């Protein structure tokens, strides 16, 4: 059962590229038999998991300022669908929200804080604009570089 999924990016953007890599990594962790999921740049694609901005799919963007306001849109089946956002950061948030809706948990920073179930992904529908434009935490003390990077990764998975 190899290449069960495909990931298609609607545009070439550093953050969307990272979102595609993260989706590929976690799909493989959840379903090792799904094989090596190919990632490609295919604007206008209509199959596979499609990552892009809301406008790439003709979806309305209710954000006042798309650069600062995060809108996440998910409309998937078991074989793929749309993971979109108001900006590239929101596309990454859409990937993490999709994974959480499928049972993944990011409990605390670092690999040990992740719970990734072994299961087939299910279709999801979700659309939300963030309640607050600015979200996050602060760190106190003197974290190491490794701790700081793990914290940044964790906060992104919490859509902050």
Q: Model-derived features: where do they sit?
A:
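Flexible, charged surface loops at secondary-structure boundaries
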Residues: 1-2, 42-46, 75-77, 130-131
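Cell-envelope and extracellular/periplasmic
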Residues: 1-12
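Short, well-ordered secondary-structure micro-motifs within conserved domains or adaptor modules
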Residues: 36-65
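Feature activates predominantly on carbohydrate-active enzymes
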Residues: 10-22, 26, 65-160
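N-terminal segment of the mature soluble domain
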Residues: 21-40
């Amino acid at each position: 059962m190899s290449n069960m999924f495909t990931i298609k990016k609607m545009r070439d953007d550093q953050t969307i590229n990272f979102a595609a890599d993260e989706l590929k990594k976690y799909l493989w962790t959840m379903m090792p038999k799904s094989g090596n999921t190919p990632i490609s740049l295919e604007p206008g694609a209509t199959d596979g998991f499609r990552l892009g901005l809301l406008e790439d799919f003709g979806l309305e963007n209710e954000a006042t300022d798309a650069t600062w306001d995060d809108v996440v849109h998910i409309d998937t089946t078991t074989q793929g669908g749309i993971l979109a956002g108001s900006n590239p950061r929101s596309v990454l948030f859409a990937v993490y929200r999709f994974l959480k809706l499928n049972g993944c948990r990011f409990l605390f920073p670092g690999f040990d804080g992740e719970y990734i179930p072994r299961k087939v992904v299910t279709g999801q529908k979700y659309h939300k604009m963030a309640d607050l434009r600015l979200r996050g935490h602060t760190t106190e003390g003197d974290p190491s570089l490794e701790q700081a990077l793990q914290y940044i990764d964790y906060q992104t998975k919490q859509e902050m």
